[in-house]
Amino acid sequence: KEKEVVVIIGPSGSGKSTILRCLNHLEVPSGGKITIDGIVLEEGANLNAIRREVGMVFQRFNLFPNMSVLENIMLAPMQVRGKTKEEAKAKAMALLKRVGLENKADSMPDELSGGQQQRVAIARALAMNPQVLLFDEPTSALDPEMVKEVLDVMKSLAREGMTMVVVTHEMGFAKEVGDRVLFVDKGVILEEASPEEFFTNPKNQRTKDFLSKIL
């Protein structure tokens, strides 16, 4: 739903990231249909049109190492949205300010910490004005002291009404920000509930076992 934050949790190797990657056909589902905004997602002309509206933030940032921070953010709006260099730069600088990194515009990715790189990756995704943002374990590759700076940006986006699907092991984020929580194991969604119900009164025994080990 629009402005909803859906959090997907589960053990490692359970298929959480695969679900996320199927939402924009980075991986092709072996069966069934995925419908986004009333459009069935399939190979063809509509796939790229839908991908333009779906931003993705990866576990390991995936910034282009040969481009500056500013160039990383400007690239897609210019090549895909047809923005002028001036328009793309103005948008990129505004987004860098939003994530607290306007002083890093001319830096190269390898000059940044992991937390800073992930905030740049979020700004890059936002530069396309997506209708929904997908986050694939955005904090799992970060040092513990850098996790908060990324989660703070994500919480801010949620407060502003960004529609988000988040695969994460950050249970505090799921409780605080999520509107719905999905529990996935062995490629199957075993449980779906509000955060309050999910964490205080899970129904599925596998969910109970999982939560008992991590909380």
Across the structure, where does each feature detected by a protein language model lie?
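ABC family nucleotide-binding domain
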Residues: 1-195
